[in-house]
Amino acid sequence: MKDYLIKATVPGVRAFCTVTTESVAEAVTRHDCYPIAAAALGRTMTASLLLAANLKTDECITIRICGNGPLGEVVADAGANGIVRGTVRNPHIDLPLKNGKLDVGGAIGIGLISVTRFTGMKQPFTGSSHLVTGEIAEDLTNYLAWPGTSHSSNRRPGTARW
């Protein structure tokens, strides 16, 4: 199955859904990621594609998640053209399961999520917010809803679900 992105719009609402299995599998293989790093990288890559779906043709987005956990930094870039790439600083992290699930939040730790939008202008626009759980979907939702930066006008209220 190939990766794909579906866009739906009605007056006042935009929705995006994506399948990124092949892109994430390629990144996980290239970086030799253990399961927790694979989950964090895949979620971040998918989130960057979802945000990039709103961009103009020549624009791109970078999501940078910097936490104090053992995973370190997770970064993903995506363009409006659907091309995505990502990396994780420490791909060989292994933590015990938390409530039967991968502890991505524990691997990322406490820190910041930053989103940079490159528009072709001289200076990119960057906004950031504190990580809420480190599980990425909640952190992205908090970023989209948080009015605490000078570039909050670049944000559209939204939520992310896995």
Describe these PLM feature segments.
Residues 1-162:
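Interaction interfaces in information-processing and related assembly proteins
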